[in-house]
Amino acid sequence: MQDAENVAVPEAAEERAEPARQQPASESPPTDEAAGSGGSEVGQTEDAEEDAEAGPEPEVRAKPAAQSEEETATSPAASPTPQSAERSPSQEPSAPGKAEAVGEQARGHPSAGAEEEGGSDGSAAEAEPRALENGEADEPSFSDPEDFVDDVSEEELLGDVLKDRPQEADGIDSVIVVDNVPQVGPDRLEKLKNVIHKIFSKFGKIINDYYPEEDGKTKGYIFLEYASPAHAVDAVKNADGYKLDKQHTFRVNLFTDFDKYMTISDEWDIPEKQPFKDLGNLRYWLEEAECRDQYSVIFESGDRTSIFWNDVKDPVSIEERARWTETYVRWSPKGTYLATFHQRGIALWGGDKFKQIQRFSHQGVQLIDFSPCERYLVTFSPLMDTQDDPQAIIIWDILTGHKKRGFHCESSAHWPIFKWSHDGKFFARMTLDTLSIYETPSMGLLDKKSLKISGIKDFSWSPGGNIIAFWVPEDKDIPARVTLMQLPTRQEIRVRNLFNVVDCKLHWQKNGDYLCVKVDRTPKGTQGVVTNFEIFRMREKQVPVDVVEMKETIIAFAWEPNGSKFAVLHGEAPRISVSFYHVKSNGKIELIKMFDKQQANTIFWSPQGQFVVLAGLRSMNGALAFVDTSDCTVMNIAEHYMASDVEWDPTGRYVVTSVSWWSHKVDNAYWLWTFQGRLLQKNNKDRFCQLLWRPRPPTLLSQDQIKQIKKDLKKYSKIFEQKDRLSQSKASKELVERRRTMMEDFRQYRKMAQELYMKQKNERLELRGGVDTDELDSNVDDWEEETIEFFVTEEVIPLGSQE
């Protein structure tokens, strides 16, 4: 064997064999290790490529080594067959004996190779000198030994190639049947054909059509044949349910579906009962006795993630894991799930032990979004997708884990690409001159068509109803406009025309009671930009609009979540001011208060309203102002140097400021404050990255019940005050608890001692001759009388002199 492998082949033989080989001549044979277990996977890939190039005859085999040189020279043995595909592609045979030896090593049959070398044609060592003398070399043989059994199927070996193999088709795969087509006569048939062709040619080239007729009219159904079965499938997917007019809605099916539906068994098979997977109480944290909230913390530059209970003194750790996520985490809108990011997809966790609830495979996922109802999850990956299988954006069903639909993503899009309605029944996306609105659970277009809106720039859903707002810029003499549309009827309930518009921003109040359109304008005859706040009162008839104009630069705008006030930061540093406005019931917008010389660039309202934090983040060194808007007083002014984030807890009782390692590499920590601006905690975490409060679902109490609780608040306040006194300090709380435990232990011991004392009473009576010494007056002789005298001094003081 070794001699056969070391024999060199003349250059002339290599040059003649070169056209027949597909491997480059510069490649060297692999070692035994590479030809053995390590070369199988590579060999499969390379041979699959060679099979694709070899043509439609994958069963052609190499001629046996026993053939003559003439037969070998004329045989098509250049390309390896699928049966010998396990041979490493880097092997370049230099002689028949060597080719057989290396080939047998790659297949893992060394004994068979030895038999081939010692066959009837002589050994490889004898064959090669004869070839050298004649100046020629035999072509290599790739044939298998007689006792070789190939137990690898073509599907396992060349599955990626065979899936693209042409398949036989009888032509009906490209035919669709369209029902509910208008029945027309010959005079209108041509017009109907034009309409049908216009609708269905969007999905592919139509090569044939057939309109059955009866009594001089069409029968109401037609047959269309596409150039490709894929086009037919696309037509069924998108045109089924297409509404032609009020009386005709198309029903589209593949022609091959008739066989499928006609062969359905009449016997009903009872489906197997799926075992119920108990996930536990996914909202357990809402039953916490002290009504504490939870929050997640990522630190050590993302290597560790922890979940804490929020406690006034010190946070209480619930769960901590290493490498729980690869980037960041996100809570679902109602706090049921915690989403973690991984290279291969998204995982959802929940329950008291934070077990994995669901996972979604999406390679390279970077962004996600939940529907407000927590029924659907949207994932985005920047990896390239194909026209036939869009994978950039995928919508998943959270309960089942199934993929609902995939979408393409334009490079210029901004996240979130899909925006959800308040109840999760609709979601929409904006493309060039188009607003596409989809409905759940079908994930199809509403009414099977998109809205054509020329020049649409932005849109936003109302948080309190299925109303969508969008704006369109000016086009020559046509003014810009803001439109409010009711869905699913698509009725325009309000249109507002605007002039000299530069830009618009849409701001909804949390309950959907108001919409503010921030309009940047350049009025004629003036220099600079003027900002108008167009306030739409959504709960009133015909949606009246009020306007507030400001000529200063606008830094930030924010609505009070549960109220009718809004705040505006305006001006330029160092003269930045904040103004608070109130929208009255009569429509008048009143300026409540304006604070000058503020170091702030962001507004953070409490989730319950009334209280607001004005923060100067990042470049403004973390200046903080805590304001009570009920009387517009500044409760406290503080600073968290280089603060990058501010997060209110869901109840509005606490607020967290933090310095993230993602934005600033030193002094990474998060501080806990009360809503009044009193600092409670300073929590320093190594390379702290992110803190997120766990959201709470909407309350189940009615407005009347909430009013009653507020009315009886004094009754509950005594209990709360007592708890507050006990928890004023950690030391006092521990001391009281220790004393309470000692007192309870003493009471139990005293009770046990009294019971034992009473059990021993009869024994005491016997020992004392029947005298009950338990009573003090049981023996009068034992009494001793003692008299105690107290000396009293009497002093008389006259009240006045006697005359």
Curated annotation (Swiss-Prot):
Positions of modified residues (Phosphoserine): 37, 40, 68, 75, 79, 84, 88, 90, 111, 120, 123, 141, 143, 153, 228
Top-level taxon: Eukaryota
Processing after translation: Phosphorylated. Phosphorylation is enhanced upon serum stimulation.
Pfam families listed in its UniProt record: eIF2A, RRM_1
InterPro entries reported for this sequence: EIF3B, eIF3B_RRM, Nucleotide-bd_a/b_plait_sf, RBD_domain_sf, RRM_dom, TIF_beta_prop-like, WD40/YVTN_repeat-like_dom_sf
Ranges where the record places region Sufficient for interaction with EIF3J: 159-263
PROSITE patterns to which the protein is assigned, alphabetical: RRM
Protein's name in the database: Eukaryotic translation initiation factor 3 subunit B
Underlying gene: Eif3b
